[in-house]
Regions:
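Acidic, low-complexity intrinsically disordered regions
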Residues: 1-335
Protein backbone atom coordinates (compact mmCIF):
# COMPACT_ATOMS: atom_id res chain seq x y z
CA UNK A 1 0.00 0.00 0.00
CA UNK A 2 2.74 2.45 0.83
CA UNK A 3 5.83 3.26 -1.23
CA UNK A 4 8.48 0.59 -1.32
CA UNK A 5 11.25 2.76 0.07
CA UNK A 6 9.33 4.80 2.64
CA UNK A 7 11.05 5.47 5.97
CA UNK A 8 9.76 7.32 9.00
CA UNK A 9 10.66 8.28 12.56
CA UNK A 10 7.44 9.56 14.13
CA UNK A 11 7.88 9.40 17.93
CA UNK A 12 5.38 7.70 20.19
CA UNK A 13 3.68 10.07 22.61
CA UNK A 14 0.44 10.13 24.56
CA UNK A 15 -3.08 10.86 23.42
CA UNK A 16 -4.60 14.17 24.50
CA UNK A 17 -8.18 15.27 23.88
CA UNK A 18 -9.48 18.80 23.64
CA UNK A 19 -10.59 18.97 27.27
CA UNK A 20 -6.90 18.84 28.25
CA UNK A 21 -7.18 15.42 29.86
CA UNK A 22 -3.83 13.79 29.14
CA UNK A 23 -3.86 10.19 27.97
CA UNK A 24 -0.22 9.86 28.84
CA UNK A 25 1.96 7.63 30.93
CA UNK A 26 0.04 4.66 32.22
CA UNK A 27 1.23 1.78 34.37
CA UNK A 28 1.81 -1.35 32.38
CA UNK A 29 0.30 -4.46 33.91
CA UNK A 30 0.35 -8.07 32.88
CA UNK A 31 -2.92 -9.08 31.23
CA UNK A 32 -5.51 -10.33 33.67
CA UNK A 33 -6.33 -14.04 33.54
CA UNK A 34 -8.80 -14.60 30.74
CA UNK A 35 -12.10 -16.37 31.09
CA UNK A 36 -12.79 -19.32 28.85
CA UNK A 37 -14.79 -18.12 25.87
CA UNK A 38 -17.72 -20.00 24.43
CA UNK A 39 -16.43 -21.69 21.27
CA UNK A 40 -18.99 -19.94 19.09
CA UNK A 41 -17.18 -16.63 19.71
CA UNK A 42 -13.66 -17.88 18.97
CA UNK A 43 -14.43 -17.93 15.23
CA UNK A 44 -17.53 -15.89 14.50
CA UNK A 45 -19.27 -16.82 11.26
CA UNK A 46 -21.01 -14.59 8.75
CA UNK A 47 -24.52 -15.01 10.05
CA UNK A 48 -27.02 -12.74 8.31
CA UNK A 49 -28.42 -11.98 4.88
CA UNK A 50 -30.41 -8.75 5.32
CA UNK A 51 -29.79 -5.46 7.06
CA UNK A 52 -32.98 -5.96 9.07
CA UNK A 53 -31.60 -9.24 10.44
CA UNK A 54 -28.38 -7.53 11.53
CA UNK A 55 -30.23 -4.61 13.12
CA UNK A 56 -32.55 -7.00 14.96
CA UNK A 57 -29.61 -9.08 16.17
CA UNK A 58 -27.87 -5.95 17.45
CA UNK A 59 -30.95 -5.08 19.48
CA UNK A 60 -31.35 -8.65 20.76
CA UNK A 61 -27.70 -8.65 21.85
CA UNK A 62 -28.47 -5.62 23.99
CA UNK A 63 -26.44 -3.20 21.91
CA UNK A 64 -28.44 -0.01 22.14
CA UNK A 65 -25.55 2.26 21.23
CA UNK A 66 -21.95 2.05 20.11
CA UNK A 67 -19.05 4.42 19.73
CA UNK A 68 -17.51 4.69 16.29
CA UNK A 69 -13.88 5.37 15.37
CA UNK A 70 -12.81 5.88 11.75
CA UNK A 71 -9.34 5.33 10.26
CA UNK A 72 -8.48 6.26 6.66
CA UNK A 73 -5.54 4.90 4.66
CA UNK A 74 -3.46 7.62 3.00
CA UNK A 75 -0.65 5.47 1.62
CA UNK A 76 0.80 6.16 -1.81
CA UNK A 77 -0.56 3.03 -3.44
CA UNK A 78 -3.96 4.72 -3.48
CA UNK A 79 -2.63 6.44 -6.61
CA UNK A 80 -2.59 3.19 -8.61
CA UNK A 81 -4.80 0.60 -6.88
CA UNK A 82 -7.84 2.06 -8.66
CA UNK A 83 -6.40 1.11 -12.06
CA UNK A 84 -9.13 -1.45 -12.74
CA UNK A 85 -11.87 -0.55 -10.29
CA UNK A 86 -11.74 3.26 -10.48
CA UNK A 87 -10.76 3.95 -14.10
CA UNK A 88 -7.12 4.53 -13.26
CA UNK A 89 -7.79 7.46 -10.94
CA UNK A 90 -6.42 7.90 -7.44
CA UNK A 91 -8.82 6.41 -4.93
CA UNK A 92 -8.56 9.72 -3.05
CA UNK A 93 -9.42 11.90 -6.05
CA UNK A 94 -12.02 14.48 -5.00
CA UNK A 95 -14.63 15.61 -7.52
CA UNK A 96 -18.33 15.99 -8.17
CA UNK A 97 -19.00 12.31 -7.42
CA UNK A 98 -17.98 10.47 -4.27
CA UNK A 99 -14.79 8.42 -4.45
CA UNK A 100 -14.69 4.87 -2.98
CA UNK A 101 -13.63 6.13 0.45
CA UNK A 102 -16.50 8.60 0.57
CA UNK A 103 -18.97 5.96 -0.62
CA UNK A 104 -17.91 3.52 2.09
CA UNK A 105 -18.09 6.21 4.79
CA UNK A 106 -21.56 7.27 3.64
CA UNK A 107 -23.06 3.78 3.54
CA UNK A 108 -21.67 2.74 6.93
CA UNK A 109 -22.73 6.09 8.34
CA UNK A 110 -26.31 5.65 7.22
CA UNK A 111 -26.40 2.20 8.81
CA UNK A 112 -24.69 2.92 12.13
CA UNK A 113 -26.07 6.40 12.77
CA UNK A 114 -28.92 4.98 14.85
CA UNK A 115 -26.44 3.19 17.14
CA UNK A 116 -24.13 6.17 17.74
CA UNK A 117 -26.26 8.28 20.04
CA UNK A 118 -23.78 11.08 20.77
CA UNK A 119 -22.92 11.49 17.06
CA UNK A 120 -19.25 12.13 17.94
CA UNK A 121 -16.83 10.20 15.74
CA UNK A 122 -13.05 10.32 16.34
CA UNK A 123 -11.45 10.24 12.88
CA UNK A 124 -7.82 9.61 11.98
CA UNK A 125 -5.60 9.22 8.95
CA UNK A 126 -2.49 7.08 8.61
CA UNK A 127 0.18 6.24 6.05
CA UNK A 128 0.79 9.79 4.81
CA UNK A 129 4.16 11.58 4.88
CA UNK A 130 3.61 12.77 8.46
CA UNK A 131 2.68 9.41 10.00
CA UNK A 132 4.13 6.66 7.78
CA UNK A 133 3.64 3.37 9.70
CA UNK A 134 4.33 4.80 13.17
CA UNK A 135 1.36 7.05 13.96
CA UNK A 136 -1.96 8.61 13.04
CA UNK A 137 -3.20 12.17 12.57
CA UNK A 138 -6.52 13.51 13.79
CA UNK A 139 -9.01 15.13 11.43
CA UNK A 140 -9.06 18.20 13.71
CA UNK A 141 -6.02 20.10 15.05
CA UNK A 142 -7.19 19.78 18.67
CA UNK A 143 -8.00 16.06 18.24
CA UNK A 144 -11.71 16.54 18.83
CA UNK A 145 -14.09 14.17 17.06
CA UNK A 146 -16.15 14.88 13.99
CA UNK A 147 -19.81 15.64 14.61
CA UNK A 148 -21.58 13.01 12.54
CA UNK A 149 -20.69 11.48 9.20
CA UNK A 150 -21.42 14.65 7.24
CA UNK A 151 -18.62 16.30 9.19
CA UNK A 152 -16.39 13.27 8.53
CA UNK A 153 -16.92 13.68 4.79
CA UNK A 154 -16.45 17.45 4.91
CA UNK A 155 -13.16 17.25 6.82
CA UNK A 156 -11.96 14.44 4.54
CA UNK A 157 -12.43 16.70 1.51
CA UNK A 158 -10.56 19.53 3.21
CA UNK A 159 -7.66 17.35 4.33
CA UNK A 160 -7.00 15.36 1.15
CA UNK A 161 -5.53 18.26 -0.91
CA UNK A 162 -3.16 19.18 1.94
CA UNK A 163 -1.44 15.85 2.54
CA UNK A 164 1.21 13.81 0.78
CA UNK A 165 0.49 10.12 0.31
CA UNK A 166 3.34 7.95 1.56
CA UNK A 167 3.79 4.68 3.48
CA UNK A 168 4.68 1.97 4.35
CA UNK A 169 1.40 0.46 5.50
CA UNK A 170 0.63 -0.79 8.98
CA UNK A 171 -2.74 -0.96 10.69
CA UNK A 172 -1.10 -1.17 14.12
CA UNK A 173 -1.10 2.60 14.83
CA UNK A 174 -4.83 3.08 14.16
CA UNK A 175 -5.71 -0.05 16.16
CA UNK A 176 -3.54 1.17 19.05
CA UNK A 177 -5.24 4.58 18.83
CA UNK A 178 -8.61 2.85 19.11
CA UNK A 179 -7.46 0.82 22.13
CA UNK A 180 -6.37 4.03 23.84
CA UNK A 181 -9.80 5.58 23.26
CA UNK A 182 -11.59 2.46 24.53
CA UNK A 183 -9.42 2.31 27.65
CA UNK A 184 -9.98 5.96 28.47
CA UNK A 185 -13.73 5.58 27.97
CA UNK A 186 -13.79 3.13 30.87
CA UNK A 187 -14.24 0.15 28.59
CA UNK A 188 -17.22 1.27 26.53
CA UNK A 189 -17.93 -0.80 23.41
CA UNK A 190 -16.43 0.71 20.25
CA UNK A 191 -16.37 -0.15 16.55
CA UNK A 192 -13.23 0.76 14.61
CA UNK A 193 -13.89 1.24 10.90
CA UNK A 194 -10.68 1.11 8.84
CA UNK A 195 -10.96 1.90 5.14
CA UNK A 196 -7.86 0.91 3.18
CA UNK A 197 -6.69 0.05 -0.32
CA UNK A 198 -4.82 -3.22 0.10
CA UNK A 199 -2.24 -5.18 1.96
CA UNK A 200 0.00 -4.35 4.87
CA UNK A 201 3.47 -3.63 3.48
CA UNK A 202 5.54 -6.70 2.71
CA UNK A 203 9.11 -5.92 1.66
CA UNK A 204 10.87 -7.82 -1.12
CA UNK A 205 13.45 -8.64 1.56
CA UNK A 206 10.88 -10.56 3.61
CA UNK A 207 11.50 -14.26 3.16
CA UNK A 208 8.90 -16.91 2.41
CA UNK A 209 7.06 -17.88 5.58
CA UNK A 210 8.26 -14.76 7.37
CA UNK A 211 6.40 -11.61 8.37
CA UNK A 212 7.43 -8.04 7.66
CA UNK A 213 7.64 -5.73 10.66
CA UNK A 214 4.40 -4.06 9.53
CA UNK A 215 2.61 -7.42 9.26
CA UNK A 216 3.90 -8.52 12.65
CA UNK A 217 2.93 -5.25 14.34
CA UNK A 218 -0.54 -5.36 12.80
CA UNK A 219 -1.17 -8.94 13.92
CA UNK A 220 0.07 -8.16 17.43
CA UNK A 221 -2.22 -5.13 17.60
CA UNK A 222 -5.26 -7.17 16.51
CA UNK A 223 -4.49 -9.79 19.17
CA UNK A 224 -4.05 -7.13 21.88
CA UNK A 225 -7.26 -5.41 20.80
CA UNK A 226 -9.20 -8.60 21.53
CA UNK A 227 -8.66 -7.86 25.24
CA UNK A 228 -10.82 -4.75 24.82
CA UNK A 229 -14.51 -4.27 23.90
CA UNK A 230 -13.51 -3.29 20.37
CA UNK A 231 -14.68 -4.62 17.02
CA UNK A 232 -12.52 -3.95 13.96
CA UNK A 233 -14.08 -3.68 10.50
CA UNK A 234 -11.62 -3.36 7.62
CA UNK A 235 -13.20 -2.20 4.37
CA UNK A 236 -11.09 -2.84 1.28
CA UNK A 237 -11.38 -0.33 -1.57
CA UNK A 238 -9.60 -0.46 -4.92
CA UNK A 239 -8.05 -3.43 -6.71
CA UNK A 240 -6.45 -5.22 -3.74
CA UNK A 241 -4.83 -7.75 -3.30
CA UNK A 242 -6.80 -8.97 -0.29
CA UNK A 243 -5.41 -12.40 0.60
CA UNK A 244 -3.71 -11.22 3.81
CA UNK A 245 -6.84 -9.34 4.88
CA UNK A 246 -8.81 -12.58 4.62
CA UNK A 247 -6.15 -14.26 6.76
CA UNK A 248 -6.58 -11.53 9.36
CA UNK A 249 -10.33 -12.17 9.29
CA UNK A 250 -10.20 -15.93 9.72
CA UNK A 251 -6.89 -17.27 10.93
CA UNK A 252 -5.15 -15.08 13.53
CA UNK A 253 -4.55 -17.31 16.57
CA UNK A 254 -4.47 -16.44 20.26
CA UNK A 255 -7.22 -13.82 20.20
CA UNK A 256 -9.56 -13.53 23.16
CA UNK A 257 -12.40 -13.41 20.64
CA UNK A 258 -12.80 -13.05 16.86
CA UNK A 259 -12.67 -9.25 16.70
CA UNK A 260 -11.89 -8.61 13.02
CA UNK A 261 -14.11 -8.49 9.94
CA UNK A 262 -12.87 -7.86 6.38
CA UNK A 263 -15.25 -6.62 3.67
CA UNK A 264 -14.31 -6.32 0.00
CA UNK A 265 -16.09 -3.08 -0.95
CA UNK A 266 -14.96 -3.23 -4.59
CA UNK A 267 -16.25 -6.76 -5.13
CA UNK A 268 -19.69 -5.90 -3.76
CA UNK A 269 -20.09 -2.53 -5.46
CA UNK A 270 -18.98 -3.84 -8.88
CA UNK A 271 -21.91 -6.25 -9.10
CA UNK A 272 -24.45 -5.60 -11.84
CA UNK A 273 -27.42 -5.20 -9.52
CA UNK A 274 -29.55 -2.37 -8.16
CA UNK A 275 -27.41 0.24 -6.29
CA UNK A 276 -29.58 0.04 -3.17
CA UNK A 277 -29.16 -3.72 -3.10
CA UNK A 278 -25.37 -3.32 -3.32
CA UNK A 279 -25.36 -0.79 -0.50
CA UNK A 280 -27.43 -3.13 1.65
CA UNK A 281 -25.15 -6.09 0.93
CA UNK A 282 -22.10 -4.02 1.85
CA UNK A 283 -23.64 -2.85 5.12
CA UNK A 284 -24.72 -6.39 6.02
CA UNK A 285 -21.25 -7.80 5.33
CA UNK A 286 -19.60 -5.05 7.36
CA UNK A 287 -21.83 -5.41 10.41
CA UNK A 288 -22.88 -9.07 10.50
CA UNK A 289 -20.34 -10.11 13.15
CA UNK A 290 -21.02 -7.18 15.50
CA UNK A 291 -23.87 -8.86 17.47
CA UNK A 292 -21.76 -11.92 18.32
CA UNK A 293 -18.67 -9.82 19.00
CA UNK A 294 -20.61 -7.65 21.43
CA UNK A 295 -21.95 -10.76 23.18
CA UNK A 296 -18.38 -12.04 23.44
CA UNK A 297 -17.26 -8.88 25.27
CA UNK A 298 -20.11 -9.42 27.73
CA UNK A 299 -19.26 -13.06 28.35
CA UNK A 300 -15.56 -12.29 28.78
CA UNK A 301 -16.26 -9.55 31.30
CA UNK A 302 -14.21 -6.99 29.36
CA UNK A 303 -17.10 -4.60 28.66
CA UNK A 304 -17.05 -1.65 31.03
CA UNK A 305 -13.64 -2.49 32.46
CA UNK A 306 -10.30 -0.73 32.22
CA UNK A 307 -7.62 -3.20 31.21
CA UNK A 308 -4.68 -1.11 32.41
CA UNK A 309 -2.28 -2.09 29.65
CA UNK A 310 -3.48 -0.40 26.47
CA UNK A 311 -1.09 1.72 24.39
CA UNK A 312 -0.75 5.41 25.21
CA UNK A 313 -1.19 6.94 21.79
CA UNK A 314 -1.42 10.56 20.68
CA UNK A 315 -2.48 11.67 17.20
CA UNK A 316 -0.61 14.28 15.23
CA UNK A 317 -2.53 17.31 13.93
CA UNK A 318 -3.87 17.07 10.37
CA UNK A 319 -1.40 17.98 7.63
CA UNK A 320 -1.19 21.74 7.02
CA UNK A 321 -3.74 22.41 9.73
CA UNK A 322 -3.07 26.15 9.44
CA UNK A 323 -4.68 25.98 6.01
CA UNK A 324 -7.70 24.01 7.17
CA UNK A 325 -10.60 25.91 8.61
CA UNK A 326 -10.97 25.41 12.38
CA UNK A 327 -14.45 26.08 13.82
CA UNK A 328 -14.92 26.91 17.47
CA UNK A 329 -13.54 24.28 19.79
CA UNK A 330 -16.04 21.57 20.65
CA UNK A 331 -15.14 19.74 23.83
CA UNK A 332 -16.04 16.11 24.04
CA UNK A 333 -15.85 14.03 27.14
CA UNK A 334 -15.76 10.37 27.97
CA UNK A 335 -18.81 9.45 29.98
Amino acid sequence: MGGKNSRETTPDTSYQRSNSVTYAARHQHAPAPQRRLDRRYSRIGDNYETLEQVTSALAQAGLESSNLIVGIDFTKSNEWTGMRSYNGRSLHSVGALQNPYEQAISIIGQTLAAFDEDNLIPCFGFGDASTHDHGVFSFYPDSRPCQGFEDVLSRYREIVPQLKLSGPTSFAPIIEMAMTIVEESGGQYHVLLIIADGQVTRSVDTGSGQLSSQERNTIEAIVKASNHPLSIILVGVGDGPWDLMKEFDDNIPARTFDNFQFVNFTDIMSKNVDPLRKQTEFAVNALMEIPSQYQATLQLGILGARRGYSPATVPLPPPSNDILRSPSVHQYHVN
